A protein has these predicted regions:
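GNAT-family acyltransferases
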Residues: 1-100, 165-176
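A short, internal acetyl-CoA/4′-phosphopantetheine-binding micro-motif in the GNAT/acyltransferase core
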Residues: 73, 87, 100-111, 139
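Conserved G/P- and acidic residue-centered "switch" motifs that form tight phosphate/ATP-binding loops
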Residues: 78, 113, 130, 142
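Conserved acetyl-CoA-binding loop-helix of GNAT-fold acetyltransferases
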Residues: 102-105, 111-124, 128, 147-151
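Conserved GNAT acetyl-CoA-binding A-motif
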Residues: 126-137
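Conserved beta-strand-loop-alpha-helix junction that forms the acyl-donor binding cleft
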Residues: 136-146
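Conserved catalytic-core motifs of GNAT/GCN5-like acyltransferases
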Residues: 137-138, 155-170
């Protein structure tokens, strides 16, 4: 699969490929984890500008953490199959509920190993940030994400309940 996919940051011409992703997720119960603020934007230029704010301390919104957004593109047809976001460090909320990594795969592209590939291939970037392990969380009802995390060496660390969303998250650590 290494030759089939690539992780790229959403800048320049590649950004046009994200235009249809929110439509593909709408109507689903998906939270679009790993897509950054994409759901809030119709205008991709505005999305790009907002995403850039999370890459530098001087423009980072208050209470947020530095983050790098990646698109997962299938090379054979230049199709956007998923997104993954790396949070450079954890604040109190992310330490409990979000973790270092969030990811989503386009519903029509699921069960093809793309989430596992993204999680594996973003790990060298995490190491380059000085991280020795990463926290990855998933809903306790999301068997696919659980399998993805376990396939990448995830060690179960317990659960956390989000009362505001009435959801239980499973927490896993992956050693880099």
């Amino acid at each position: 699969m290494n030759d089939e996919l690539m992780l790229v940051e959403p800048f320049g011409g590649i950004l046009r490929r994200t235009r249809r992703l929110p439509e593909r997720f709408s109507g689903n119960s998906d939270s679009m984890d790993g897509c950054g603020p994409l759901r809030r934007f119709d205008d991709m230029k505005a999305y790009l500008e907002d995403t850039m704010r999370y890459t530098r301390e001087e423009t980072l919104p208050e209470g947020m953490v530095l983050a790098t957004q990646f698109l997962c593109i299938r090379k054979s047809d230049n199709r956007l199959v998923g997104m993954i976001q790396v949070r450079h460090y954890l604040n109190d909320f992310l330490r409990t509920f979000g973790g270092h990594i969030g990811y989503s795969v386009r519903p029509s592209e699921r069960r093809k190993g793309y989430a596992s590939w993204m999680l594996k291939n973003v790990q060298p970037y995490c190491k380059s940030l000085g991280l020795s392990e990463i926290l990855v969380c998933c809903l306790d009802t999301n068997e696919g994400s659980r399998r993805t995390i376990l396939k990448n060496g995830g060690r179960f660390d317990g659960t956390a309940y989000r009362a505001d969303e009435n959801k239980t998250l499973e927490r896993y650590w992956i050693t880099l």
